[in-house]
């Protein structure tokens, strides 16, 4: 960042969001992004759109940013409104500006091991696993969830260091028993507290990708909203060798990877 600033290069992240729910998981992510950007001297510009925005409106904004030579980094928060095809919108992001790595061209490059802007959440998961010091070669790694920008890229990335990878979903038969055999367990199913202690091999590395805002009893006869993951942290924590927290785990690491990609995109855009 300092070298870019010294050369007069402005690093900015343009983020598009379409929701009216100020308590959504996407807005939690937005707050983390803005805070981290400000701390690092990266300009953050949020393009807030209505939760009822249609494809033409959202696509038009993304195309405008993609074609703007002064814009070097673009991301689109999911989910988009139900009627909007996220694949089509993500395909409109210029690959060189796609700092979340969600354009189909960037995702495809993962399979071939080509250098590109890779999906941030998948990168964050890999960095967290690396931080534990575990040698993935020959280890059993199980991924719960097979979304196009999280589960599938993570599975492919785990294959590079020669882990034995099993890609599953919440409907996989005998899933708890399969999970208990895994040395590394990644929960990315989008189901609050799906993974319990019975799923976890003692000492396993468990990465919780999920983030949900749920209502719980506040102890005073009412309810309150709290943030939880796909893992039941209370039961899994004592069993796992490592459990990434929610909040405070994959979320901040994903923001860090996003900003790493943002700086890389700004550098590549330099004449």
State where each predicted segment sits.
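Charged, compositionally biased N-terminal leader segments and the immediate start
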Residues: 1-20
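Anion-binding alpha/beta catalytic cores of soluble intermediary-metabolism enzymes, centered on
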Residues: 3-5, 9, 72-136
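Short beta-strand elements in bilobed, periplasmic/extracellular small-molecule ligand-binding domains
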Residues: 13, 37-51, 165-167
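Short beta-strand segments
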Residues: 17, 75-79, 144, 208
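Glycine-rich phosphate/diphosphate-binding loop of Rossmann-like nucleotide-binding domains
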Residues: 23-35, 116-205, 209, 214, ...
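Short, well-structured alpha-helical segments in soluble
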Residues: 57-69
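Short glycine-rich anion-binding loops that position phosphate/pyrophosphate groups of nucleotides
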Residues: 77-83, 191-193, 211-214, 249
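Rossmann-fold NAD(P)-binding glycine/threonine-rich loop
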Residues: 86-107, 207-270
């Amino acid at each position: 960042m300092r070298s870019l600033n010294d050369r007069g290069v402005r690093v900015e992240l343009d983020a598009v969001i379409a929701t009216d729910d100020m308590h959504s998981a996407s807005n939690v992510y937005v707050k983390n992004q803005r805070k981290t950007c400000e701390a690092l001297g990266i300009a953050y510009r949020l393009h807030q759109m209505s939760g009822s925005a249609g494809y033409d409106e959202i696509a038009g904004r993304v195309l405008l940013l993609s074609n703007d030579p002064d814009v070097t980094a673009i991301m689109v928060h999911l989910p988009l409104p139900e009627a909007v095809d996220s694949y089509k919108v993500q395909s409109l992001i210029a690959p060189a500006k796609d700092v979340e790595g969600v354009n189909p061209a960037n995702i495809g490059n993962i399979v071939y091991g080509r250098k590109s802007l890779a999906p941030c959440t998948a990168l964050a998961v890999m960095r967290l696993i690396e931080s534990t010091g575990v040698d993935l070669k020959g280890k059993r790694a199980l991924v719960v969830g097979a979304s196009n920008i999280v589960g599938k890229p993570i599975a492919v990335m785990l294959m590079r260091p020669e882990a034995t990878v099993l890609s599953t979903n919440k409907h996989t038969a005998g899933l708890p028993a399969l999970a208990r055999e895994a040395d590394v367990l990644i929960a990315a199913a989008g189901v609050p507290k799906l993974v319990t202690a019975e799923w976890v091999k003692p000492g396993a590395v468990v990465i919780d990708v999920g983030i949900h805002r749920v209502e719980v009893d506040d102890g005073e006869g009412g309810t309150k909203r709290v943030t939880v993951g796909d893992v039941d942290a209370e039961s899994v924590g004592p069993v796992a060798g490592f459990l990434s927290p929610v909040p405070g785990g994959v979320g901040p690491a994903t923001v860090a990877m996003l900003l790493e990609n943002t700086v890389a995109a700004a550098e590549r855009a330099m004449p």
